[in-house]
């Protein structure tokens, strides 16, 4: 994924970096260091889970609702050995633009969207399952800035 990578290091500690979403650092030959958050699912499905609530008891936000200090989110399916590498700022931009709509569609189980609740000891983690093709299109379109839009922050172009 990074042809100019010179080193890869793992963040195994429970530290500030981990709280900011950093699981790995990739050093490039230019000297730039990329921060990566990793998400894993055993079996590949036609969707990507976006965790919007980490803990239903405390109300802690899920990772998609946090200002993580990462460059990329690596979303891997273990059995198929396929990994989607999402630029974090574009993924967040897509979520901020469409998250409410996706949540509504998931609540109604429309177009492949579903709500997922993962039981943990003493709490539940909540995610929206977004069809992979729709998420990829939304992230792609998040890279297009509409300079004609009113307001201080231009909106991404809505996928068709």
Language-model features: where?
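Conserved catalytic cores of phosphodiester-cleaving nucleases, focusing on short active-site segments
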Residues: 24-46
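Catalytic cores of nucleic-acid endonucleases
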Residues: 7, 39-83
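Non-catalytic C-terminal interaction segments of nucleic acid-processing enzymes
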Residues: 30, 79-160
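Short beta-strand or tight-loop elements
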Residues: 20-22, 69
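Acidic-basic catalytic patches of nuclease active cores, encompassing PD-(D/E)XK
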Residues: 1-20, 40-46
């Amino acid at each position: 994924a990074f042809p100019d990578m010179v080193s890869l290091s793992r963040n195994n500690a429970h530290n500030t970096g981990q709280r900011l979403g950093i699981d790995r650092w990739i050093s490039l030959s230019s000297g730039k260091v990329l921060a990566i958050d990793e998400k894993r699912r055993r079996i590949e499905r036609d969707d990507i889970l976006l965790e919007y609530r980490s803990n239903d008891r405390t109300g802690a936000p899920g990772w998609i609702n946090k200002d993580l200090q990462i460059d990329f989110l690596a979303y891997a399916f273990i059995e198929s050995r396929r990994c989607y590498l999402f630029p974090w700022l574009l993924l967040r931009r897509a979520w901020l633009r469409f998250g409410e709509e996706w949540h509504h569609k998931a609540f109604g189980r429309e177009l492949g969207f579903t709500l997922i609740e993962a039981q943990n000891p003493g709490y539940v983690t909540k995610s929206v399952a977004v069809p992979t093709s729709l998420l990829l299109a939304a992230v792609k379109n998040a890279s297009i800035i509409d300079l004609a839009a009113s307001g201080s922050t231009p909106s991404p172009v809505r996928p068709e």
